[in-house]
Amino acid sequence: MSLSTEQMLRDYPRSMQINGQIPKNAIHETYGNDGVDVFIAGSGPIGATYAKLCVEAGLRVVMVEIGAADSFYAVNAEEGTAVPYVPGYHKKNEIEFQKDIDRFVNVIKGALQQVSVPVRNQNVPTLDPGAWSAPPGSSAISNGKNPHQREFENLSAEAVTRGVGGMSTHWTCSTPRIHPPMESLPGIGRPKLSNDPAEDDKEWNELYSEAERLIGTSTKEFDESIRHTLVLRSLQDAYKDRQRIFRPLPLACHRLKNAPEYVEWHSAENLFHSIYNDDKQKKLFTLLTNHRCTRLALTGGYEKKIGAAEVRNLLATRNPSSQLDSYIMAKVYVLASGAIGNPQILYNSGFSGLQVTPRNDSLIPNLGRYITEQPMAFCQIVLRQEFVDSVRDDPYGLPWWKEAVAQHIAKNPTDALPIPFRDPEPQVTTPFTEEHPWHTQIHRDAFSYGAVGPEVDSRVIVDLRWFGATDPEANNLLVFQNDVQDGYSMPQPTFRYRPSTASNVRARKMMADMCEVASNLGGYLPTSPPQFMDPGLALHLAGTTRIGFDKATTVADNNSLVWDFANLYVAGNGTIRTGFGENPTLTSMCHAIKSARSIINTLKGGTDGKNTGEHRNL
């Protein structure tokens, strides 16, 4: 059952209360009981979008993040005095990773934790007979090991990142717009905000433009790259008779003007930047790191209204005398803890039924239903000999190309390749269409897989990643168990997911298309032939807290306000109710912008929440 604020406080251990009173968080000593306008759980780019817009509108925001702040952008003001560090910086901006992108693979691996790990046979036949082993029929459980997870229904590679900035501290920065709806693919594509097609296009275009401005999307940062130009124009030439479009991949980044060999990748830090570098805004914002949002509590009246958020100071667990749990009260509550974290908090609050079938008294009956993910095909190729040979000849008559090659050959006469060491990587895509219903990335980047050994020079390797779309179906579920907890003492997530036949057919065609495109570029790297990746590896889980028009099939309305709740909002990729192949971050930011404007309008009384605030490098 869901808890009221009074029940939460009554159940709270007397030993943890302060002088027998409600253990309020220390922020209320500064702001008072009614001084917090917006509580946000989660500090990724979506939570940061809410924070930026709300703070710029003059609202006081308290944000909690379960992880630590471990990457910072340090700025120096013009007069030379130090400006405070801004958290959530993209870790790939470190020079060592820009010089050797394959080393960044291990950073990504270290930042990801699997969500649900099936418990396999733990019998080790060659183990010392006197050593411990699990009794027959039982298993050890820790760090995501889940005895309830059936392997054939799992998204085995689905993972989460805990830390300020979330996955934006290591993401690929790909920010395409999700394609508009297509009649031949119902349930897939950009979700509708209006049933009037013209109004829907107008609103989405405005939201996408604002999101692109906020995160700093560009398609021009790799224009003066030999490899990018070679791959892009070669594919355009190969497919010109079929009129298939190949174009630069939209990326949230900018090339440094004074050091053009480096690109700066954007992250949540770019959204936090204006807050941390404006004294007035900074006073309106509090970020509590290493704080878990445990659950939410209702006010206890007839209205479904959140009265408090219970948070736990994870660092205080090291000191038994420290205050572990406390309560934060706000006017509005925003959950931006990811497609796993949001339903986990709501489930732990008692707002949804157990297991697969919702209970009749569930406050949020569609929580964790209709989930979608992206089947993913991957390969790596080594560029064709004739393409590499053509580099010396400046085949497209570009002055910057000719100069870069000449300088490289002059400085490095023993190098077998004419491609400069610091030549930017390719960043190419072909759009999602009815004929080719998948998103593509033809590039060279670091993921949790696809690292290249020393045998082949990275300059001639191209990665091909194809992302498919799956159909939203009510029986594809994310459920939670009380008898098993994750590594952070929250209910263990379990997937009940099976793709539709139509989704599988599209995935087969997607693989064939990737192989055809790859054959136009070069030969397969023996260690990375065409393959389907583990389910969930795209890390684009969606639909867990889906929003939309239909209360019967969604969790919240199009302003992300949970149905029948007065002040509870959901945010992030989980809000996207449709299937899609593109990277979802930009679309989730659009939902956040629309939602933040609604919150500002409610709390400020009549403003639309739009702003023209400045932000770093954009």
Curated annotation (Swiss-Prot):
UniProt keyword list: FAD, Flavoprotein, Oxidoreductase
First-tier enzyme category under EC: oxidoreductase
Residues that hold substrate according to the record: Q441, H443
PANTHER family in the record: PYRANOSE 2-OXIDASE (PTHR42784:SF1)
Chemical reaction(s) catalysed: D-glucose + O2 = 2-dehydro-D-glucose + H2O2
Cofactor note: Binds 1 FAD covalently per subunit.
EC number: 1.1.3.10
Cofactor(s) the protein needs: FAD
Residue numbers annotated as active site: H540, N583
Domain of life: Eukaryota
Function: Catalyzes the oxidation of various aldopyranoses and disaccharides on carbon-2 to the corresponding 2-keto sugars concomitant with the reduction of O(2) to H(2)O(2).
Modified residues (Tele-8alpha-FAD histidine): H170
Stated family: Belongs to the GMC oxidoreductase family.
Protein name per the record: Pyranose 2-oxidase
Pfam families with a match to the protein in the record: GMC_oxred_C
InterPro entries: FAD/NAD-bd_sf, GMC_OxRtase_C, P2OX, P2Ox-like
GO molecular function: flavin adenine dinucleotide binding; pyranose oxidase activity
Complex and partners: Homotetramer.
